[in-house]
Every structure is written in C-alpha cells, then in structure tokens.
C-alpha cells in the first residue's frame, strides 16, 4: 500500500483476515487518529491505558498515527484523505476520536463516509453499568445489552436534495406523474432505502454475537406498523435469518409461550420484535428483558444514545463500527470543541472503546482488566468534572484520570 504523507511503523505486524477470522499477532500495528476537539485529550489518555493493559498480558500495540478532520485538512487539504482509509483497509482495526460535522451545510459527515467507504455495516454499542457512576434510574445494574445498528442504509444513506434544487423538483414531478403522489414543491427530499441484503447481514451478526456470548435474546426493533415496506421488511427479514440460518439456536417469542410455557430452554435464543417508540419505554421499565438489540440506522442512532443515559451518559459510552474482517472503534460522544485542550473531559468512553477493540481482536483478558480498572477508579471517587458534579469525590483532569486507571489496572 502506498502512502502520501504518513509512513507505517517498521516494527509490528499486520492483523490478517483469513477464512472469516482475524489472525492477530502479539504486536499488531493499529492505526489511530485523534480527530477533532477533545479527541486530542481523550485519545492519548486511552492509549496510555491500552498500552498498560497490553503490557499486562505480554503484548504490545504498535500505533500508527493517521489523520482525519481538521488536522487532515491542514496536512492534505482534505478532511478524509486516502492515506487514512488505506491504513484502515490494510491494518483492519483502527481507534478513532470524535469528528466534527457541521449541521446543515459544509461537508457530509466524515463518520458516515468512513462507514460507507469501508462497508462498516454494523454500529455495535455495548451498554452496561459501571459501579459508582451516577444514573437517573433506580436499578442501573440491570442494564446490560448490546445494540447492533445498521450503518449503511435508511435515511442516513445521504441520498437527499435541498428544497428547490433541480433534483428535488424532478423527483417531486416524477412521483406525481408516475404514481399520483403529491409532495409540496418547497420540500427537501430524502430517500429511505432498507434492503434485504443489508438487513440480513446485520441480524446475522447480531445472532452470531448472541450465540458466541451466551446471550438470551435478540430483539428486532422497527417502526413497521407505519413504514411497512422498509421497517416492516426489516422485521420480516430478521425473522427469516433466525429461522433459516439459526433454526437450531433460535425460537420466537410465540414459540417460547406456545411450546415451552414461557420457560426458555437451555441453549436457545429468543428472537422477538418491538415497535421502536415502545422500545424507548421498554428499556426504562423492563430493562433486564433485553439482551441483544438489532435496529435500522435512524432508530438505532436514537435508541443507542438514549440507552447511554441509563448508565451515566455519552461520556462513558463506547462504540464501534464493524464490517467483515474490519473494525473502526470510536466513542459515542461528539467532539465538544469548547472543551478541547483543557485536560478536563472524561476519557472513559474512549478508554472503554479501546477495551471493546481489544475484545474484538481477541484480547479479552486485557479488555476485562480495563473495564475493572475504570470501575475501581470511579468507585474510589476519582472522577472528572462531569461525574464529580453529581457525586462529589476527587475531581481530576483527563490525564490524571487515565493515570489513576493505569495504577488500578497494574494492581490487578
């Protein structure tokens, strides 16, 4: 692979993808980019923790810095240069910080572009509670589910045109002339594609995850009562995957009651579905009934951010974007430019995102140690300002919090 302005490390080895599995050396080269705003605070803090955890299990990450966002524009004249995309393609796993996308204009979302170009079709977000973190619900310890959000389609596909544009007016006229559908001419237009292919590969990944991690259920969340041929089709195709490809592992909710009297058989996963708006109150009132959740893109975005509130907010929520043999790991929160460079913000989301990355490459012991060390740090009262304002304790900066996590990690 040729690079224009960056050079891969000479030491370290590539992660390979063979026969549907990652082959991970003890010293993998992993690209990273800090991104915008607070990325320059939280990514170095996370790397400090990740290095300590890797060392603890006798391994080493060889980091390869690449660029996206404002830094990339200054260096390349391009917010998302080919060097960065090529590095992710070549080395297969990357850690990223948040990227800024202006609302209403400028350039299209860099996050969406990365997902589409690399075909990172599943946004995977584990949602679990860390002891000691303030939560708005009475029993946050019941929260433990993983959200699989389809990443490439739906209204986030970026197929849209502004009000009054030639494309929008042409489409409005076409719909009226061909199908008798009337849309006001002063409308912006967006398209909502949901395909059988994209739906099935997402649900397939979610069910495989449930099987491999001994999860009890997979819930298909949709708005199919209104959008029957997009969201409703998502539901139907999801059930098809469960029945046709995982029939020996899966039963439906109806079968659970009709055949088994409501008692879940050992080794079986219950596949069920919920209407999207209902699901928002379900995760509050019936939290522990949900395990793995699969959704289309838009509702997945909404639900995953709402779910983060249950366990303390976006500042501690990790995330990832996964394709076939390729993964980019990013925190859920944004770039928060007003706090950039102040050594103030909470790096927990980025640290736990790194733990999720380690889990993905098979370093599960290191991943668990990181999560335990973060929990120990917060439970001891060492916290950043966002948590301190709710629970008191010792308020520390970004770097100091990371160092406290490292200290606790080394004691394990």
From Swiss-Prot:
D-threo-isocitrate binds at residues 109, 111, 115, 125, 149. The record marks 156, 223 as: Critical for catalysis. InterPro entries: IsoCit/isopropylmalate_DH_CS, Isocitrate_DH_NADP_dimer_prok, IsoPropMal-DH-like_dom. NADP(+) binds at residues 100, 333-339, 346, 385, 389. It holds the Pfam family Iso_dh. PROSITE patterns: IDH_IMDH (PS00470). Binds 1 Mg(2+) or Mn(2+) ion per subunit. Mg(2+) can partially replace Mn(2+), resulting in approximately 70% of the maximal activity with Mn(2+) in vitro. Catalyzes the oxidative decarboxylation of isocitrate to 2-oxoglutarate and carbon dioxide with the concomitant reduction of NADP(+). NAD(+) can replace NADP(+) with low efficiency. Belongs to the isocitrate and isopropylmalate dehydrogenases family. NCBIfam families: PRK06451.1, PRK07006.1, prok_nadp_idh. This is Isocitrate dehydrogenase [NADP]. It comes from Archaeoglobus fulgidus (strain ATCC 49558 / DSM 4304 / JCM 9628 / NBRC 100126 / VC-16). The gene is icd.
């Amino acid at each position: 692979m040729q690079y224009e302005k960056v050079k891969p490390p000479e030491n370290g080895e590539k992660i390979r993808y063979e026969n549907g599995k990652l082959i991970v050396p003890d010293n993998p080269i992993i690209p990273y980019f800090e991104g915008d705003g607070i990325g320059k605070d939280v990514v170095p803090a996370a790397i400090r923790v990740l290095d300590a955890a890797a060392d603890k299990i006798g391994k080493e990450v060889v980091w390869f810095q690449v660029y996206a966002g404002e830094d990339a524009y200054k260096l390349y004249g391009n917010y998302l240069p080919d060097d960065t995309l090529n590095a992710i393609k070549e080395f297969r796993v990357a850690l990223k910080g948040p990227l800024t996308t202006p609302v209403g204009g400028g350039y299209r979302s860099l996050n969406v572009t990365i997902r589409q170009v690399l075909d990172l079709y599943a946004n995977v977000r584990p949602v679990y509670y860390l002891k000691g973190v303030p939560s708005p619900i009475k029993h946050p310890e019941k929260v433990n589910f993983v959200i699989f959000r389809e990443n490439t389609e739906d209204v986030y596909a970026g197929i849209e045109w502004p009000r009054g544009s030639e494309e929008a007016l042409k489409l409005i006229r076409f719909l009226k002339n061909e199908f008798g559908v009337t849309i006001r001419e002063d409308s912006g237009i967006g398209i909502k594609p949901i395909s059988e292919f994209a739906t099935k590969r997402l649900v397939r990944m979610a069910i495989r995850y449930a099987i491999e991690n001994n999860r009890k259920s997979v819930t298909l969340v949709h708005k199919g009562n209104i959008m029957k041929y997009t969201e409703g089709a998502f539901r139907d195709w999801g059930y098809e995957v469960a029945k046709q490809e995982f029939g020996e592992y899966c039963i439906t909710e109806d079968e659970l009651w009709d055949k088994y009297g409501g008692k879940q058989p050992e080794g079986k996963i219950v596949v069920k579905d919920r209407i999207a708006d209902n699901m928002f109150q379900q995760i509050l009132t019936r939290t522990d009934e949900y395990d793995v959740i699969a959704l289309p893109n838009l509702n997945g975005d909404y639900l995953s951010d709402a779910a983060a509130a249950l366990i303390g907010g976006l500042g501690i929520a990790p995330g990832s974007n996964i394709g076939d043999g390729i993964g980019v790991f990013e925190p859920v929160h944004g770039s928060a430019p007003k706090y950039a460079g102040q050594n103030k913000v909470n790096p927990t989301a980025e640290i736990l995102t790194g733990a999720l990355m380690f889990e993905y490459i098979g370093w599960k012991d290191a991943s668990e140690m990181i999560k335990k060390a973060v929990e120990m740090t917060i439970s001891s009262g060492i916290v950043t300002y966002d948590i301190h304002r709710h629970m008191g304790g010792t308020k520390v900066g970004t770097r100091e919090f990371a160092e406290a996590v490292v200290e606790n990690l080394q004691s394990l």
